[in-house]
Amino acid sequence: MGFGKGHHLHLIDGSAFIFRAYHALPPLTRKSDGLPIGAVSGFCNMLNRYLEDIDGPDAPTHVAVIFDHSGHSFRNEIYDHYKANRPPAPEDLVPQFPLTREATKAFNIACEEMEGFEADDMIATLAFRARDAGGRVTIISSDKDLMQLVGDGIEMYDAMKNKRIDREGVFEKFGVYPDRVIDVQALAGDSVDNVPGAPGIGVKTAATLINDFGDLDELLRRSDEIKQPKRRQTLIENAEQIKL
């Protein structure tokens, strides 16, 4: 991508922008043909506001907006109930998806998506490549799933809250540092993504267990050492679904 030391890449979670715009604004249609455009309008306003706010010494040298390709990804092949509880996208939002891609390109910003992969996957891949090339990365998103990427050379920025999220910010949210976020999520589950986890184990308890045992594999290997009977039982009985 022509990227290296001294460069600063911003990766925008475009799919999150679209849904935020859709739910935040009243319906709007194009007078000429009745095409829904409310989410597109909101998306463009958000993107324009972002561009106005990034001037300064810490401005990015590269920017890309990343989109989900579809509702199906390789994770559905691994776990067929993944996100199965989510309803399909609203009918009036579907025709706006391609329009947001066109709008992104009209802003002269790179627009990326890949079949079989979610925006999160592409953001992770691009972020690691950019970091490994010697540059810095800022992920523009409030998605908690992306917090596991935060570390040396990679930070997050929640544009809605005007808040930067570094390693300490991740610890404040999860009770663990970024490299153990995925372990906490595996234990506590995620109702948004329909990931089961261990029944009765919440984020705080999961963080305590991970901090006590070091990581998820060690916790499951030594689960018989847990003193609380119910907690010990749920980990032993649900070990396989926790590993999902």
Question: What kind of feature is each model-predicted range?
Answer:
Residues G2-G6, Y50, I54-A64, I109, ...:
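Non-catalytic nucleic-acid-binding/docking modules located in mid-to-C-terminal regions
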Residues G2-I140, K144-D166, Q241-K243:
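Noncatalytic, basic helical substrate-engagement surface that gates or grips nucleic-acid strands
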